């Protein structure tokens, strides 16, 4: 099998949520899958990455996480993902996966694709630099519209409220455990890692969700544990990412400075006192009276007679 994922950056083997979930799951069960870093989503049946290409046979490429987990269970490797879960634990895993998809995933989409400052500073620049022109324009527009459709018009406050609650729920479930179902990783751990790792590692000018995640030390520890055990970066990847760090720091700093400048300008504009309301009312009344009299004279409602004085 070949697993095609987006390239690595920001201390991660890939910055894409779904790519991280596929990759983490394959590594947790020591699957002999061949990982291919790619920036060619058009080769996938749905035009997105990740994609699992099964080299032997004529099987269609897989782009669905649950189908990929099923494939891993049947591959015959020594470590079988989710093999030790009871029926109740499997049901809980499914319920938790659904809960995260509806409460945490929208916030991740909003953070990277709907927040204009984050999108213009990080997301758009990263994908545009990895895709060739003019395909990058088409892909970014398509991906952004898809994200907005999935958000369904929810306002920022509602999205963040659901996400904060989801993070607190995750933190409570993890507790002091190494993984979410004890000391052995499951597909739920891969799923959660894919959601949390980009939020924790990718620098963003609007970082409200990052701040909330950082306030949950056990979730931060979980991300670091999975990264160090299952997804360590090669020396070449570390060097390449290090060379880009200053550029990203500069972009983030400039975006934050522009944000503060815009906020200061807005506050200054709001501080300018409005015209006195009494004066406006008086001027409006006088103007209305003048117009009314002029209209009445013009239509003949008021007649003005002029008498000439006869000289004796």
Curated annotation (Swiss-Prot):
InterPro entries: Glutathione-S-Trfase_C-like, Glutathione-S-Trfase_C_sf, Metaxin1/3, Metaxin_GST, Mito_Protein_Transport_Metaxin, Sam37/metaxin_N. Keywords: Membrane, Mitochondrion, Mitochondrion outer membrane, Protein transport, Transmembrane, Transmembrane helix, Transport. GO terms for cellular component: cytoplasm; SAM complex. Its main location: mitochondrion. Gene3D superfamilies: 1.20.1050.10. It comes from the Eukaryota. CDD domains: GST_C_Metaxin1_3 (cd03212), GST_N_Metaxin1_like (cd03078). The chain crosses the membrane at residues 282-302. The keyword ATP-binding does not apply. Signal peptide: none annotated. It is found in: Mitochondrion outer membrane. One of its GO terms (biological process) is protein transport. Associates with the mitochondrial contact site and cristae organizing system (MICOS) complex (also known as MINOS or MitOS complex). Belongs to the metaxin family. Involved in transport of proteins into the mitochondrion. Essential for embryonic development. This is Metaxin-1 homolog. It comes from Caenorhabditis briggsae.
């Amino acid at each position: 099998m070949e697993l095609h994922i987006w390239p690595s950056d920001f201390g991660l083997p890939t910055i894409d949520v779904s790519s991280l979930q596929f990759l983490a799951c394959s590594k947790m069960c020591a699957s002999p899958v061949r990982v291919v870093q790619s920036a060619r989503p058009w080769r996938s049946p749905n035009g997105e990455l990740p994609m699992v290409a099964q080299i032997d046979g004529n099987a269609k490429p897989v782009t669905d996480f649950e189908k990929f987990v099923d494939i891993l269970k049947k591959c015959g490797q020594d470590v079988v993902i989710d093999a030790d879960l009871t029926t109740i634990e499997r049901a809980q895993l499914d319920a938790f996966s659904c809960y995260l998809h509806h409460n945490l995933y929208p916030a991740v989409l909003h953070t990277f694709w709907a927040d204009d400052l984050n999108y213009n500073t990080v997301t758009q620049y990263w994908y545009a630099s990895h895709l060739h022109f003019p395909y990058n324009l088409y892909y970014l527009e398509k991906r952004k519209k898809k994200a907005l459709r999935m958000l369904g018009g929810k306002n920022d406050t509602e999205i963040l409220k659901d996400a904060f609650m989801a993070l607190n729920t995750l933190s409570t479930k993890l507790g002091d455990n190494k993984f979410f179902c004890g000391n052995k990783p499951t597909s739920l751990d891969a799923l959660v890692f894919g959601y949390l790792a980009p939020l924790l590692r990718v620098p963003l000018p609007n970082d409200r969700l990052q701040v909330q995640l950082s306030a949950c030390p056990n979730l931060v520890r979980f991300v670091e544990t999975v990264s160090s055990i299952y997804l360590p970066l090669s020396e070449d990847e570390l060097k390449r990412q290090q060379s880009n760090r200053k550029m990203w720091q500069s972009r983030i700093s400039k975006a934050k400075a522009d944000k503060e400048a815009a906020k200061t300008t807005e506050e200054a504009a709001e501080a300018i006192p409005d015209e006195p309301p009494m004066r406006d009312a008086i001027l409006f009344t006088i103007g209305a009276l003048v117009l009314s009299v002029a209209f009445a004279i013009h239509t003949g409602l008021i007649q003005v007679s002029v008498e000439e004085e006869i000289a004796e």
